[in-house]
Amino acid sequence: MSKRSDGNQPRTIIDKVWDAHVVRAETPDAPAILYVDLHLVHEVTSPQAFTVLRERGLKLRRPERTLATMDHSIPTLPRGADGRWPFVDAQAAAQVSQMERNCADFGVELHGLGDEAQGVVHVFGPEMGATQPGMTVVCGDSHTATHGAFGALAFGIGTSEVGHVLASQCLLQRRPRTLAVRVDGALGPGLSAKDLILAIIARLGVGGGTGHVIEYLGPAVRALSMEGRMTLCNMSIEAGARAGLVAPDDTTFQWLAGRPRAPKGAAWDEAVARWRALPSDEGATYDRELRLDASALEPMITFGTNPGQGIAVTGLVPDPAAERDASARTTLEAALRYMGLVPGKPIAGQKVDVVFIGSCTNGRIEDMREAARVLKGRKVRTRTLVVPGSHRVKKDAEAEGIDRVVREAGAEWREPGCSMCIAMNGDDIRAGQYCVSTSNRNFEGRQGPGGRTLLASPLTAAAAAVTGAVADPRRVLEGR
């Protein structure tokens, strides 16, 4: 456990945000009570929590600090001629109607199906300007760490905790340890934040960040856009971390300015002044540190059944026989058996059946633009779904003609939603199929029973779409 700094010691941004939100300090026998600034909810993990509130006759403590959307189980196909949404089953439709009722009954602001602001929760929240530096942010979703890109302390919570926050606006939490990931150099052509985070997870392993909050530092991180920073923080959980964040700077402030929930006028100036004090103090110490050189990286892709099993697209499928640790060797053997891959064989050239471009990891406008760079003037050789992360992303992309590029390439341009990332809405792959996906998890069956997922960036996914196989996006863009 990181120790609380006294007033004279340099503090990390993690310490600063944590200390500012402690309602009751933790003890050896009890976790801290932490105040929550923003609670995001969606239709899958909130129904049970609202039911408990009803049963106990409770109201929301701070309804204005709760914001709702729909994303997990909603269709990404448009309404039918009868005006109805094509839900995959009755359960999905019931989740949506129950969400509408819950938000109406408890006074929660909801941006649901058909709303121009609706989107995947971790795309929608920042677009609304609801996510701001120095906040504590929670959501009943694993990838809430996305909001850490704004210098917020953001983490996923379980359904029972969703109920706790709705009723009290507080949460029981143990103070996390701190991990600094410093990234020197600069990402080369054809690389993005997705390649960087896959490389970091490959180095740390899926349990390397357990019990920690990661702060991403260094020139390569500072050079990222806000979209890139959100991608980076989004997958912190895949290294086992509780959360991940990037300290706010002018890039952050410029992105937030003018958004619906961002402060306005004099309040904006006051907020920016506060936010500028958030970055870690010079001399602040961390429990652990990791250093990488971005200029040494190549486009990444996963080959196995967890996000830590990643290699360069130019690399070879690892051989379990070279693994000294017996447990790690067994894990690798099982992964390759499920994936049907041969040790020592190049990953490039592996046949692909489906490509998915979207999700809370890579469903933003920058991701749509990157995919379009590869798709423009080419034809896809495999089924390809491009799913914007929100209606705002969709609208902006269509204004730029990206939808036309996607359709002319033979790919599908869909409505916003989680879609094939979690495959709850009918967007899935069949057993044995290979899918290059810009999402965040490649667990067995994640995209459909027996489906095989390879995680990659939008550029690498689009390169797979137009070649029908795993390919180096740099070579595709160069016309080779």
From Swiss-Prot:
<dbReference type="InterPro" id="IPR004430">
    <property type="entry name" value="3-IsopropMal_deHydase_lsu"/>
</dbReference>
<feature type="binding site">
    <location>
        <position position="360"/>
    </location>
    <ligand>
        <name>[4Fe-4S] cluster</name>
    </ligand>
</feature>
<keyword id="KW-0028">Amino-acid biosynthesis</keyword>
<keyword id="KW-0456">Lyase</keyword>
<dbReference type="GO" id="GO:0003861">
    <property type="term" value="F:3-isopropylmalate dehydratase activity"/>
</dbReference>
<dbReference type="GO" id="GO:0009098">
    <property type="term" value="P:L-leucine biosynthetic process"/>
</dbReference>
<dbReference type="Pfam" id="PF00330">
    <property type="entry name" value="Aconitase"/>
</dbReference>
<dbReference type="InterPro" id="IPR036008">
    <property type="entry name" value="Aconitase_4Fe-4S_dom"/>
</dbReference>
<dbReference type="InterPro" id="IPR050067">
    <property type="entry name" value="IPM_dehydratase_rel_enz"/>
</dbReference>
<dbReference type="GO" id="GO:0046872">
    <property type="term" value="F:metal ion binding"/>
</dbReference>
<feature type="binding site">
    <location>
        <position position="418"/>
    </location>
    <ligand>
        <name>[4Fe-4S] cluster</name>
    </ligand>
</feature>
<keyword id="KW-0432">Leucine biosynthesis</keyword>
<keyword id="KW-0411">Iron-sulfur</keyword>
<dbReference type="InterPro" id="IPR033941">
    <property type="entry name" value="IPMI_cat"/>
</dbReference>
<dbReference type="InterPro" id="IPR018136">
    <property type="entry name" value="Aconitase_4Fe-4S_BS"/>
</dbReference>
<keyword id="KW-0408">Iron</keyword>
<protein>
    <recommendedName>
        <fullName>3-isopropylmalate dehydratase large subunit</fullName>
        <ecNumber>4.2.1.33</ecNumber>
    </recommendedName>
</protein>
<dbReference type="InterPro" id="IPR001030">
    <property type="entry name" value="Acoase/IPM_deHydtase_lsu_aba"/>
</dbReference>
<comment type="subunit">
    <text>Heterodimer of LeuC and LeuD.</text>
</comment>
<dbReference type="InterPro" id="IPR015931">
    <property type="entry name" value="Acnase/IPM_dHydase_lsu_aba_1/3"/>
</dbReference>
<keyword id="KW-0100">Branched-chain amino acid biosynthesis</keyword>
<comment type="similarity">
    <text>Belongs to the aconitase/IPM isomerase family. LeuC type 1 subfamily.</text>
</comment>
<keyword id="KW-0479">Metal-binding</keyword>
<dbReference type="GO" id="GO:0051539">
    <property type="term" value="F:4 iron, 4 sulfur cluster binding"/>
</dbReference>
<feature type="binding site">
    <location>
        <position position="421"/>
    </location>
    <ligand>
        <name>[4Fe-4S] cluster</name>
    </ligand>
</feature>
<keyword id="KW-0004">4Fe-4S</keyword>
<comment type="function">
    <text>Catalyzes the isomerization between 2-isopropylmalate and 3-isopropylmalate, via the formation of 2-isopropylmaleate.</text>
</comment>
<comment type="pathway">
    <text>Amino-acid biosynthesis; L-leucine biosynthesis; L-leucine from 3-methyl-2-oxobutanoate: step 2/4.</text>
</comment>
